[in-house]
């Protein structure tokens, strides 16, 4: 056991305490997978990260990401929040204005030169969502099929079962699942309009919560899908967490064929943890 630098960060919100909380252990070298999982479970946050020495010469650090139930290849708010913590702890990127994170999906760049930090969205695989699964989701959510405009199955590390509705108001009107099961993992809704350009909800998070406050990896997958299919053009402001009292804001843009996902982070706890 040793004392390690620790921070807790609120991510993807302009207002501290209104985003998605993240635990970050900055001195993560030497911990076993089980030790990291045990600590992540103990924090009871959606994700806990461990910053370690990189194995790639091009990376500034390696990031291990754990949910309450297991390790994740990639996640969005851990990417931005861990980067903010690393920089606040004195980290200096090898390339000016760009932090390079090594994680389960490879190297992810986090640009520091814009109005807010933004990461390059990982490649997203797009497949059809099985019609029978759409019916199961609609039945579980009491969702009328005539509200649906498109569906898709997206994968950028996590897998997302996406249902696009006509309007943001339709998204906000849906009640969360009353029953939980693996068939409803990663169910996401989106609709145009509302307080931002797009309203998003993650009703099947990997954590024990009924709804995730703000999900960077989901919004990255949605942005890749929508920009690549021509559904979105220009910068977009995405709201998430509205129904559970959060002010989540994700900023998406596509520049020269690369999708960027940005957001603000606030360090609310800075200290040490004994692990």
Predicted regions and their residues:
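Active-site proximal loop and beta-alpha junction motif in alpha/beta enzyme cores
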Residues: 1-74, 80-275
């Amino acid at each position: 056991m040793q004392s390690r630098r620790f921070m807790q960060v609120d991510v993807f919100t302009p207002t501290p305490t209104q985003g998605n909380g993240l635990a970050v252990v900055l001195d993560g070298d030497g911990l076993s997978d089980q030790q990291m999982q045990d600590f992540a479970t103990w924090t009871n946050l959606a994700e806990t990260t461990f910053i370690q020495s990189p194995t790639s010469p091009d990376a500034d650090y390696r990031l291990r990401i754990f949910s309450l139930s297991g390790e994740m290849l990639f996640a969005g708010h851990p990417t931005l929040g861990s980067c903010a913590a690393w920089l606040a702890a004195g980290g200096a990127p090898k390339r000016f204005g760009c932090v390079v994170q090594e994680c389960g999906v490879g190297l992810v760049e986090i640009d520091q030169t814009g109005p807010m930090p933004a990461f390059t969205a990982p490649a997203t695989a797009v497949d059809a969502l099985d019609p029978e699964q759409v019916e199961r989701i609609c039945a579980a959510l009491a969702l009328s099929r005539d509200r649906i405009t498109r569906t898709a199955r997206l994968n950028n590390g996590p897998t997302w079962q996406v249902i696009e509705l006509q309007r943001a108001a339709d998204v906000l009107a849906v009640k969360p699942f009353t029953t939980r099961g693996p068939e409803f993992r990663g169910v996401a809704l989106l609709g145009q309009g509302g307080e931002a350009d797009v309203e998003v909800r993650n009703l099947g998070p990997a954590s024990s919560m009924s709804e995730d406050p703000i999900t960077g990896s989901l919004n990255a997958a949605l942005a890749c899908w929508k920009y690549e299919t021509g559904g979105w053009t220009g910068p977009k402001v995405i709201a998430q967490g509205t129904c559970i009292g959060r002010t989540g804001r994700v900023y998406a843009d596509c520049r020269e064929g690369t999708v960027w996902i940005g957001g603000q982070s606030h360090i609310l706890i800075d200290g040490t943890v004994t692990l």
